[in-house]
């Protein structure tokens, strides 16, 4: 059987498929295609990282292990995919950390505003013992194995009302947040009227003027054409979003030690490629979004940092005071 065709068992009923998959994976030397879920498409910062992972996996395993990527949430929304990996229904996937805070409080760290100053700060923290500790908590609380701390990037505000030069400029603006209490608190502290809303409804809400404002990394803002319904891009850089590449823990543990080592090595080889691509896309889309007619503003960030201090103080006990402090003050 060639390594890029599906084994017959994937067409069998799910329970049967799972037990066969586990059995097949348990025998080193058996060929295995790993289904991988992605929220965005193949040209995104996520796609570039996952495809590099697949390439290295095939090379290191001499064709025995390969991936089948499923783009644009085809296997379910991020929360369902994270749950699916834990239950053994989804093999592997990349997800923002947003839904993970619902399972493990410590992951709310990545919802907190102005924790990381720049990419180097975030990478150094995630690649340290703190990243390992969070990965351990994911194994215990979600039954998933974090293979590599890939990224979505820093999040920025867009709106259709005005430039943001100061938090006061957010007053009276109806802002959409992800379904996270931390994010609602953050945007209310900055002066906006914050409303949590499912991702699938956001574009229409902005188009119809039900919402004025949203926030996302630049590649996502470009990818979903927010420039069609938003006039202002404000480089608020308020949150750093990792996008961990993960595998169901039971599936990972079913591989031989040799294959586990290959999977981890492939992920580590893909990591710098993914992060570099993410930063390059950020620069490219900043230029392209301006060319598409968005007014780009780079506000002084100190007043924003100051305005959200109460949010960090409120949530630090939930996330863990030590973890929050370690992140903010991490030497890099």
Predicted regions and their residues:
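Bacterial N-terminal signal peptides
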Residues: 11-23
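Sec/Tat signal peptide C-region and signal peptidase I cleavage site
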Residues: 24-28
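Bacterial N-terminal signal peptides that target proteins for export
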Residues: 2-14
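N-terminal secretory/targeting leader peptides
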Residues: 18, 29-121, 130-332
């Amino acid at each position: 059987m060639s390594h890029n065709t599906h084994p017959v068992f994937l067409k069998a009923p799910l329970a049967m498929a799972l037990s066969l998959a586990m059995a097949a994976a348990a025998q080193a030397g058996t060929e295995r295609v790993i289904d991988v879920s992605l929220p965005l498409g193949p040209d995104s910062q996520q796609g570039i990282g996952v495809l590099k992972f697949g390439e290295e996996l095939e090379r290191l395993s001499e064709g025995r292990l390969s991936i089948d990527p499923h783009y644009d949430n085809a296997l379910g929304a991020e929360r369902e995919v994270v749950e699916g990996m834990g239950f053994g229904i989804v093999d592997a996937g990349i997800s923002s950390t947003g839904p993970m805070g619902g399972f493990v409080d410590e992951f709310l760290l990545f919802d907190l505003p102005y924790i990381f100053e720049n990419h180097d700060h975030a990478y150094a923290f995630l690649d340290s013992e703190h990243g390992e500790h969070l990965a351990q908590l994911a194994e215990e609380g979600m039954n998933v194995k974090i293979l590599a701390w890939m990224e979505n990037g820093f999040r920025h505000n867009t709106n259709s009302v005005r430039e943001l030069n100061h938090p006061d400029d957010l007053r009276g603006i109806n802002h959409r947040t992800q379904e996270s209490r931390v994010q609602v608190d953050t945007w209310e502290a900055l002066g906006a009227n914050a409303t949590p809303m499912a991702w699938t409804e956001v574009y229409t809400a902005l188009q119809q003027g039900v919402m004025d404002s949203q926030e996302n990394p630049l590649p996502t803002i470009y990818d979903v054409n927010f420039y069609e319904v938003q006039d202002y891009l404000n480089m608020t850089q308020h949150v750093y979003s990792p996008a961990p590449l993960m595998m169901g823990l039971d599936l990972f543990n079913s591989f031989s030690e040799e294959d586990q080592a290959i999977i981890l090595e492939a992920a580590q080889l893909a990591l710098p490629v993914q992060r570099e691509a993410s930063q390059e896309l950020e620069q490219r889309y900043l230029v392209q979004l301006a060319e598409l007619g968005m007014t780009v503003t780079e506000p002084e960030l100190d007043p924003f940092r100051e305005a959200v201090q109460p949010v960090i103080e409120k949530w630090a006990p939930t996330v863990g005071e030590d973890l929050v402090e370690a992140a903010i003050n991490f030497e890099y």
